[in-house]
């Protein structure tokens, strides 16, 4: 932080500042839970709704607004956030941009797949991993949060497996979930360390490919190989557009204000961040926390704008119908997950082309229905899986930053084409489905782009050479 700026002493320890910012977000969720109860008039159902959320299976896609009320979903999010805050504090973790990502991915899924009960087996498993490797738990705290991507498996073991109907918590189920947590906690860290060789850092959701492959293995062991029937769990309501908009727009405006308060005039340096390619970076160290807060606010408002203006075009019975996005628990979670890598490479300039790619890809199922190739249109931009998929497609932002607008558009279109098919690999039990898909897209695209376009560094060198001539 520059000398003479406001509260200069406050940012002497950036790690503590990042933790405090994340804790403030958690407090905001607690306030949101109380406000939601007043807004919907069912404040007395917040606690029962929270208990219902925690005691039900959480296989993709569960809408916690519908399952446990709006206030109950916010309370679950707040409790998950508080668990993350306390784990980081007690373990003495060094908080940085990756911690911001891990936190937001964890709380993001707390409205449609993560619960206060299904995160603990993975925190415990990662702690066991730290004991085995004889390292401080704080050094792997981020990995503990990423490991919660397997939360639906834990819920399944605790309250339903191997049947199709929930039977409630059992001792055997809790022990099985704990054993799964130890397995995931010990296996996932080395996998996460290896997967950058697959996507070369072009998938911001770097832990997602590792989670996806591991979920595929666990799914086969628990269901496919023994021949156990796979339960289905889609549970969606109509959402709550007004409340979600007011809550997040308020938070994002406060982020912009906080950035300017911590460092006057830092918004001028935000232009430098917008020009950054976003590949293998940490905005908190490269541009400072105040500028990162500005990006949090502006990128967050960009996300809200997208989810408010996006409309799906559907061909139905000889007529064209336009649908709008429902602000369900899953949509709210998508907003938070899309926000996750705001400190590690995501920003409006590099994500916009990916959204364009999604829009172009949506024309394929539309014209398939319009021309009579199929009877029913398979999906549109407002299909819930696509709304969630778009949030994880934003993880391909470094492709835009390194290879340009059209490469980013192509990445978005390919991601939209694949994302609804990938759950067949893991049965809907891996929460990082879209990030897993992004890793596959990056693995397919980057070698081809490098071969035909050259690397970012090579193209910059050519531009510099042409200027000198």
Q: What is the meaning of each model-derived region?
A:
Residues 2-114, 259-263, 285-294, 301, ...:
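N-terminal signal-anchor module of multipass membrane proteins
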Residues 177-194, 206, 381-456:
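C-terminal transmembrane helix pair
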Residues 66-78, 109-120, 169-183, 317-332, ...:
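Structural signature of hydrophobic alpha-helical transmembrane segments
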Residues 266-366:
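Transmembrane helical segments that form the transport core of multi-pass membrane transport proteins
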Residues 6-17, 135, 140, 151-245, ...:
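Membrane-interface helix-loop-helix junctions at boundaries between adjacent transmembrane segments
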Residues 235-240, 272-278, 455-469:
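Short, highly charged, low-complexity non-transmembrane loops/tails of multi-pass membrane proteins
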Residues 89, 103-134, 145, 156, ...:
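Conserved mixed alpha/beta catalytic, RNA-binding, or beta-rich assembly cores of soluble enzyme
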């Amino acid at each position: 932080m520059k000398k003479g700026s406001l509260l200069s002493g406050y940012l002497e320890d950036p790690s503590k500042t990042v933790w405090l910012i994340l804790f403030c977000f958690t407090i905001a969720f607690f306030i949101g839970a109380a406000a939601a109860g007043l807004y919907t008039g069912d404040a007395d159902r917040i606690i029962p709704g929270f208990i219902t959320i925690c005691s039900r299976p959480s296989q993709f896609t569960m809408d916690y607004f519908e399952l446990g009320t709006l206030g109950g979903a916010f309370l679950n999010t707040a409790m998950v956030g508080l668990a993350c805050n306390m784990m980081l504090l007690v373990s003495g973790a060094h908080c940085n941009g990756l911690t911001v990502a891990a936190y937001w991915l964890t709380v993001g899924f707390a409205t449609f797949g993560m619960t206060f009960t299904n995160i603990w087996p993975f925190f415990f498993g990662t702690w066991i991993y730290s004991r085995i490797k004889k390292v401080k738990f704080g050094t792997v705290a981020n990995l503990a949060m990423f490991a919660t991507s397997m939360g639906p498996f834990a819920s399944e073991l605790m309250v339903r497996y191997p049947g199709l109907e929930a039977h409630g918590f059992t001792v055997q189920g809790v022990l099985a979930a704990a054993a799964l947590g130890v397995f995931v906690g010990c296996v996932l860290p080395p996998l996460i360390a290896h997967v950058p060789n697959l996507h070369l850092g072009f998938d911001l959701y770097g832990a997602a490919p590792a989670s996806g492959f591991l979920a595929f293995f666990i799914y086969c062991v628990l269901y496919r190989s023994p021949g156990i029937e796979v339960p289905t769990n889609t549970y969606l309501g109509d959402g709550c557009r007004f409340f979600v908009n007011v809550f997040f727009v308020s938070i994002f405006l406060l982020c912009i204000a906080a950035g300017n308060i911590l460092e006057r005039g830092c918004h001028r340096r935000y232009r430098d961040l917008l020009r950054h390619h976003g590949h293998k970076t940490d905005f908190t160290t490269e541009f400072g926390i105040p500028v990162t807060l500005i990006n949090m606010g502006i990128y967050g408002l960009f996300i809200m704008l997208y989810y408010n203006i996006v409309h799906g075009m559907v061909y139905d019975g000889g007529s064209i119908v336009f649908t709008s996005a429902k602000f369900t628990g899953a949509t709210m979670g998508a907003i938070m997950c899309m926000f996750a890598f705001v400190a590690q490479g995501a920003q409006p300039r590099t994500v916009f082309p990916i959204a364009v790619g999604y829009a172009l890809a949506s024309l394929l199922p539309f014209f398939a229905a319009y021309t009579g190739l199929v009877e029913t249109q398979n999906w549109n931009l407002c299909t819930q899986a696509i709304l969630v998929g778009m949030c994880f497609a934003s993880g391909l932002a470094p492709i835009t930053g390194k290879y340009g607008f059209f490469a980013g558009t192509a990445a978005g279109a390919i991601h939209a084409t694949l994302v609804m098919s990938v759950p067949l690999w893991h049965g809907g039990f891996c929460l990082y489905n879209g990030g897993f898909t992004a890793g596959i897209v990056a693995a397919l695209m980057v070698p081809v782009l490098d071969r035909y376009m050259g690397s970012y560094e090579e193209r910059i060198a050519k531009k510099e050479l042409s200027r000198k001539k």
